[in-house]
Amino acid sequence: MKNISDCFVLNNGVKIPCVGYGTWRTPDGIDTVKAVREALDCGYRHIDTAQLYGNEESVGKGIRESGLNRSELFVTTKLKNTDQGYDSTLRAFEGSMKRLGLDYLDLYLIHWPVPAVFKDEWKQVSRDTWRAFERLYEEGLVRSIGLSNFLPHHIDNIEVSA
């Protein structure tokens, strides 16, 4: 990597900036709005957030205040564990989009593999969640989909129905 604008190419051809600005542990509020705006002013083009972080609204506001065109940015957010499952994933996505104030996402990730609330049903819940992700991708609401913090056996489970 030579500079902050260098990119990797994902399996589906979408380019993702090599360097991203993460917003974990940045609380919702004016400080996060400012931090995101300043990161974008410094040249960052990939902004990473998550439902679990509780700051999607401020991240979205920082993006809007930057004055950059949406097409210049790469925005990632992640699904919260307790929102896994087909219908709840679709609802959670709508909520994230509303909080972020965006029309589409560049990358949507399942944040963690095993929702503890589902215990023995985790395999089916994970597959249903992935099916909802595929729908969002097919509808053009998400440019790429993926997994975060998954172990091989979690991935194998999803591959069965992907």
Spell out what each predicted region is.
Residues 35-38, 42, 65, 80, ...:
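Short alpha-helical scaffold segments that flank and stabilize functional sites
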Residues 1-73:
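N-terminal binding-site loop/beta-alpha segment at the start of enzyme catalytic domains
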Residues 16-20, 46, 72-78, 104-109, ...:
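Structural preference for beta-strand elements that scaffold enzyme active sites
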Residues 17-30, 78-87, 117-122:
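Active-site mouth loops of central-metabolism enzymes
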Residues 27, 89-162:
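Glycine/proline-rich, positively charged
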Residues 24-26, 50-52, 78-82, 110-113, ...:
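Active-site beta-loop-alpha junctions enriched in small/polar residues
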